[in-house]
């Protein structure tokens, strides 16, 4: 058996951490006196960088904006990050791992952080639905193959 064939696929989470966090309620306390019928916008973005041989940082940026009419009730942004060891894969498989699999791991942490921040701002509970990062990644690949060249930024 050759050495190339003996390379096994391996994946390990080394660390998950909150890299950046922000919560703003620019119209507080007046916003608390209004009827709560917000328009909620969810923005997602992912980025990855190689830290060492077979070690990558993946950052999932989640921004939630709640608006009442033209006014922003709150704006919450979390950058949830992870350091992952990924061995034995490359090319499209590696891109999928860093662009979909790792964000799937990070999203529940970001969602919990956002829910906590919104609650601490004394706004009604915010439940973010699960995100299908596999589908978003496939859409990104399709856009790339069609020559759009868009950055891997998704609005949900």
Swiss-Prot record:
Q: Name one GO molecular function term.
A: unfolded protein binding
Q: Which GO terms describe its biological process?
A: protein folding; protein tetramerization; protein transport
List the record's Gene Ontology CC terms alphabetically. cytoplasm
Could you say which residues form the signal peptide?
none
Would the keyword Membrane be found if you checked this record's keyword annotation?
A: no
Q: Does the keyword Transport apply?
A: yes
Q: What InterPro entries would the database entry show?
A: SecB, SecB-like_sf
Q: Where in the cell is it found?
A: Cytoplasm
Keywords from UniProt, A to Z, are:
Chaperone, Cytoplasm, Protein transport, Translocation, Transport
A Pfam family found in this protein is: SecB
Question: So what does this one do?
Answer: One of the proteins required for the normal export of preproteins out of the cell cytoplasm. It is a molecular chaperone that binds to a subset of precursor proteins, maintaining them in a translocation-competent state. It also specifically binds to its receptor SecA.
Q: How does it assemble?
A: Homotetramer, a dimer of dimers. One homotetramer interacts with 1 SecA dimer.
The family classification in the record reads: Belongs to the SecB family.
Q: Which NCBIfam families match?
A: PRK05751.1-1, PRK05751.1-4, secB
Protein name per the record: Protein-export protein SecB
The record lists the organism as Serratia proteamaculans (strain 568)
